[in-house]
UniProtKB/Swiss-Prot annotation:
May function as an environmental regulator of TCP biogenesis. Negatively regulates the synthesis of the major pilin subunit of TCP (TcpA). It is a peripheral membrane protein. It comes from the Bacteria. The gene is tcpI. The keyword Zinc does not apply. Belongs to the methyl-accepting chemotaxis (MCP) protein family. Pfam families: MCPsignal. It is found in: Cell inner membrane. This is Toxin coregulated pilus biosynthesis protein I. GO terms for biological process: chemotaxis; signal transduction. Residues 344-580 form the Methyl-accepting transducer domain. GO terms for cellular component: plasma membrane. Keywords: Cell inner membrane, Cell membrane, Membrane, Methylation, Transducer. It comes from Vibrio cholerae serotype O1 (strain ATCC 39541 / Classical Ogawa 395 / O395). InterPro entries: MCPsignal_dom, Sensor-like_sf.
Amino acid sequence: MIKKIISVFLLLACIITSAFTAFFYHSKLSDQTKSISSLSSQQAQERLQSYQDSLDFYKKLNISLSVAIANSLRDKAVEELNAIALRIQENHGFIGVTFASLDGTMFTDIGTLDWNAKTLRRDWFVKTVELGTKHYTAFDIDKTTGQHVLTIATPVYVGNDIVGSVALDIAGDQIASPNGSGMFMMTDRNFNVFASDLTHSTLIGKDLTKEKPLFKNLVSGQYVTFSDADSHWFAVSQTEIDGENKLFTIIDIQQIVQTYKRDIQLIIAGFSGFSCVMLIGLYWVLSKELSGVRQIREWILSLSDGQIKERRPIKFHNELDTIAQSLENLQFRLLDVVRNSHRTMNDLSIKQTDITYSIEGNTNNSQQELGLIEQVATATTQLSCTSFDVMQQAQSAELNAETAQKLIAESHDIIDSSSKQTEMVTLSIHESQQIINQLREFSDNISSVTDVINNISDQTNLLALNAAIEAARAGEQGRGFAVVADEVRSLAVKTQQSTIDIQGIILKLQEQSQLADQVMTRNVSLIHETQVANRALIASFNLISDKVLEISNINSIVSTAANEQKIVTEDVAKQMEDIRYLVQENLSAMERTKQANQNISDLTTNLNDALSFFKIELTS
């Protein structure tokens, strides 16, 4: 327990120390940030002020030069202007000094140039001479020297008239002097360094983003810390100059970082020492106050082992006294419970034996009842099945009788229909016989006509023969007539032959008509006999239908009686099944009661065994 309390205390101490350290860390970090920002801003302002002062100085110098050389420039005193330019260049170390006249002639420290500023439309010339404004360019790399150069140009006045322009080419390190406190670098818009302190002078003319990639993503007004190869810490910040150039200010923050680390270490050491002192004090207090825990633990262990002993009251003079008193009360109550439980278990064991005997007797009686009920239920079920079979047979017979009645009715209808059709056939045969008789009469008439045609063809043949004879007598004049007569005779012969064929056909038609008349007469006789048989068959079907109807009525009565008997037997069987189910439920309940009683007996035995765990020891 003491170990757990100490562990919790150590955990809390670590958490508090960590929280305070984090708070102090952020507080110191904020102070450090403010300090670095202040130093960086101060150094940047000083460097910007120096830059601006230099720029103002050269602007004023340019104005002074414009006043000094006004008359010489107006008169184009070439040698004098070149000498002045050379002297100024040597005195101030400018990259170049140029005086330009109105026509664009350029007088420099190296002599008069052979190219014209006006013709080339130099930006500084146009703005100063033509527009009359002061001008200075951004830093650009001079093609001759490779240095970054700032050009300052001012118009030259004589009275109110512009007579020319003065231009000074100033190196970047002239405007931003490397002397002074602090480290810095100035770059153009492309991050090319044109001025720096002496420490970083090797970077002049180089791309700063390639030499110092960290500087590329700097935001104006913020700083970034970094360390060199010797783990020396610095902070760098960026400031815009003239909207295009950039000033990178570098300050040494090694002392600030060391102070910050030392303060953090002191805080951690102080809290660690304080925690150790508190831990020692806590251990001493806990050891003194919890000395009685061991005795209480032994007491509880003896109770857990079933040893119930009388003990003298224990006093610890702290909260443990309450626990000791509670244990003493628990021991007294536990003693009463164990004694009462032993007595109750003995009584319960006796009662359980009596209950077991009663349950076994009831179970035997219920099993006998169940056997008798099952026999009655079986007989009832068989009776129900027999009634059901009788009902089914009666219903089947009734259905068959109904089917027979339907078939008889349908046969009766068929016979009636057949009789009607027979009568219609008889009538049709009579009509056909009349038509055949008429056909025979027509054949006789046609035969007389063919006789007439035959006589005509004989006479025509005879006439044609006579005509041929007369044509032969006529000679050449009767030849055409002889041909016609011959054709007529030929047609008469064909007509006579056709008439003979028609007479043969008519004779056959008359013979067939006579045979058809005889057959139809015989069919009429047969149909009459069929009608007589149909009438007798209808009478037989009527008698059969009456008998089948009587059988159907008897089957209906038998089916109804069998159905009622089936319903009664099914109701009896259902009631017997319910009785059997109740008896089975009683048997199951008795079996469960028996099992529960056995379980109670087992539990009683187990409880006695469990209570035997407690060993009561009383002191005299």
